[in-house]
Amino acid sequence: DILLADFGISLSYSALSSILKNAGFESPKKKKIRHRTHRRKRKPHPGQFIQIDATPYEWFGDRVKYTLHGAIDDATGQVVGLFLTQNECLYGYLETMHQCCMDFGIPQTVYSDNHTIFRSPKTGKLTVDELIAGKTIHLTQFGRSMHELGIDLIFAKTPQAKGRIERLWATLQSRLPVEFAKRGIKTLSEANRFLETEYRKLFNQKFSVTPEAEPIFVPLSKGIDLDSILCVKHTRKTDAAGTFSFKNRCFQILD
């Protein structure tokens, strides 16, 4: 791709591989004996099923690992969000979903692993008072955000169940470091700007497929304040004096 785009040289993969091998360059990817597995059929509608995950990698080629958060549409293979942070975190996932909702719309379902960012360890452990109050499940901050947007959040039981996004990581790990190096990108802010404004579009043009049916992403209505949903919220009670505590600090509500 780079030879064609930057130098106008068109070579087949096998020809290029042979040239590099004869010059003493071996592929960094270890070849493994692969057992054939049955790939799940794609969902028909774009927006019906979004896989979300994160992967640590040496994206800048400096032996320091950063974590790339991403989301991919099952029907088209389009990357709907990418965001790079130091470690896997809620912020990275919320930014990824912000891109998805702004650029494509609100999806029907988000499919994740069982990380505590997505699934509370207290799931299924409601107290009697919580049951009496009508609470049915413990939600994480991410889960609460999805609930407010009307998105169903379901969890994968095994890494193999997230095959589509696992294959995305393999592709990005072989391509993104080269793209960063070409452009002299060495910081998180530079990388995230490139990912959101340029790379997602380039990637989707090359790798996305035509869906079987019409998109069912729900467009954002004018009344939705996305920043007030994709955020962290805490509930506190005030005392008779109109004060409440948060993280060992006391706050006074003014009239």
Regions found by a protein language model. Give the residues of each.
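RNase H-like two-metal-ion nuclease catalytic core shared by retroviral integrases
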Residues: S112-N114, T127-R175, L188-N192
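Cysteine/selenocysteine-centered motifs that mediate thiol-based redox chemistry or coordinate metal-sulfur cofactors
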Residues: I106-T123, E130
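C-terminal, beta-rich DNA-binding module of retroviral/retroelements integrases
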Residues: E198-D255
